[in-house]
């Protein structure tokens, strides 16, 4: 399990890169093998000073692996920040919807919890153009000025 990923990592490391782009590197693996590959990538990142652009849809894996997160919707970066900033204080409605879909290993909670639905029509960017706004720390969000005031409250 994970041999293809390990071979791919070894081939990439042979060229002594400063940046590795890892597109869904653990998505087809079972959880125990995912953990092994992620631990290997973290070790290499630390020991070799690598930057890894980690592209994934599994938000639990993203939170575990990342030092900094960018949330994209339709090719546009809509929110970015540290895992703590994004997961504890999401601002963009799309980010909130994504995070609400993360499964919680508690059947009673899962049965009754609600999900946030993202409705892109809440944005009227024909009237007021959006831009990237600084929230705090390393946290930024792509909204119009009036949305920023509304969502920060």
What residue spans do the PLM features occupy?
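A short, surface-exposed alpha-helical micro-motif characterized by mixed small hydrophobic
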Residues: 62-64
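Short, glycine/charged-rich "phosphate-handling" switch motifs in NTP-dependent
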Residues: 68, 80
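Helical segment within the ABC ATPase nucleotide-binding domain
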Residues: 35-48, 60
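Hydrophobic anchor residue at the start of the ABC signature
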Residues: 9, 21, 37
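A short, proline-enriched helix->beta-strand linker immediately N-terminal to the Walker B motif
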Residues: 14-18
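Charged, flexible cofactor/metal-binding loops and thiol motifs
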Residues: 82-152
């Amino acid at each position: 399990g994970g041999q293809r990923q390990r071979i791919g990592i070894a081939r990439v490391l042979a060229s002594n890169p400063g940046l590795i782009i890892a597109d869904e590197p653990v998505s087809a693996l079972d959880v125990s093998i995912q953990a092994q590959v992620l631990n290997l990538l973290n070790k290499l990142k630390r020991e070799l000073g690598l930057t890894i652009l980690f592209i994934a849809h599994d938000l639990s894996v993203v939170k575990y692996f990342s030092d900094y997160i960018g949330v994209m919707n339709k090719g546009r970066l809509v929110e970015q920040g540290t895992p703590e900033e994004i997961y504890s204080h999401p601002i963009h409605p799309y980010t909130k919807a994504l995070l609400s879909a993360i499964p919680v290993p508690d059947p009673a909670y899962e049965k009754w919890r609600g999900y946030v639905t993202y409705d892109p029509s809440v944005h009227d960017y024909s009237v007021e153009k959006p831009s990237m706004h600084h929230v705090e720390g390393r946290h930024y969000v792509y909204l119009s000025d009036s949305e920023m005031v509304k969502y920060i409250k």
